[in-house]
A protein has these predicted regions:
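Bacterial N-terminal signal peptides that target proteins for export
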Residues: 1-7
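Low-complexity, Ser/Thr/Pro/Gly-enriched N-terminal "stalk/linker" regions
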Residues: 22-74, 81, 85, 105-112
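Glycine- and acidic
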Residues: 61-66, 92, 120-125
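Long, charge-dense tracts
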Residues: 95-96
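Helix-turn/linker elements and helix-coil junctions of extended alpha-helical scaffolds
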Residues: 47, 87-91, 195
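Intrinsically disordered or highly flexible coil/loop and linker segments, enriched in small
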Residues: 49-53, 92, 175, 219
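Aromatic-lined, polymer-binding surfaces characteristic
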Residues: 72, 83-86, 100-220
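Bacterial N-terminal signal peptides
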Residues: 8-18
Length: 220
């Protein structure tokens, strides 16, 4: 057995280094960017063109007629939240930087459509059901993560419309669970961008987690 192991080791030493090479940091990053584009591109391209509701596939086991409407907000909120830190790096004169520049522009135009009542992709964050609070929180977190490249690149009318949609969710009472933090996240964005917030909705969820539910080391 030892002889076999020794022989394999000797043979391996003559093989090209690339055969057992691990991906470099640059290769890893390129893969992650490629994956990001695959996920975000269908959402942002269609949203920017006003065709998200027209082209986005929809499947659901729920009989709730509002479920389809929810799916569009989920796609937009989670996409914006997920890619915002990357977008905030800003455009650069590199391959990745040019890709990033493209998606900053798509996201900004997409957000304009998402809150424009005249757009076919207008997303209403009303209280017909409770899910809009969750979707608004993801969108709010994305805007907080990219204050320069997203919020800072929006025109004042779009900013005002986003504020209006976020405030609509104040009529939704969060469940006594992690949903409390969804309300807190919305208010944190309103505080950041307008300097106005609902004290109860901002602090109640945060204090509930800190004082009653958080046990330490990510345990609740």
């Amino acid at each position: 057995m030892k002889t076999k192991v020794w022989l394999l080791a000797v043979l391996a030493s003559f093989l090209p280094n690339g055969l057992f090479a691990h991906p470099t940091g640059g290769e890893d990053r390129a893969y992650w960017v490629e994956t990001l584009v695959k996920i975000a591109d269908p959402v942002l391209v269609n949203l920017s063109e006003g065709t998200l509701k027209k082209n986005m596939p929809f499947e659901s086991l729920s009989d709730d007629p509002l479920r389809k409407d929810v799916s569009y907000r989920e796609a937009v909120g989670r996409t914006i939240c997920g890619i915002a830190p990357w977008l905030e790096l800003g455009p650069e004169d590199t391959k990745e930087g040019k890709i990033r520049s493209k998606y900053i522009k798509l996201a900004v135009q997409g957000l304009r459509n998402a809150v424009n009542p005249q757009s076919p992709d207008y997303l209403v964050f009303d209280n017909r059901h409770s899910q809009p609070l969750v979707d608004a929180a993801f969108l709010a977190q994305g805007l907080l993560r990219a204050p320069r490249q997203l919020w800072g690149n929006l025109d004042s009318e779009t900013q005002s419309r986003i504020i209006t949609e976020l405030k609509r969710t104040r009529t939704i009472k969060p469940k006594e669970s992690n949903w409390l933090l969804f309300a807190s996240m919305v208010e944190a964005a309103l505080l950041e961008f307008t300097n106005e917030y609902d004290t109860q909705r901002l602090y109640y969820g945060v204090n509930r987690f800190l004082d009653n539910w958080y046990k330490g080391d990510a345990w609740y």
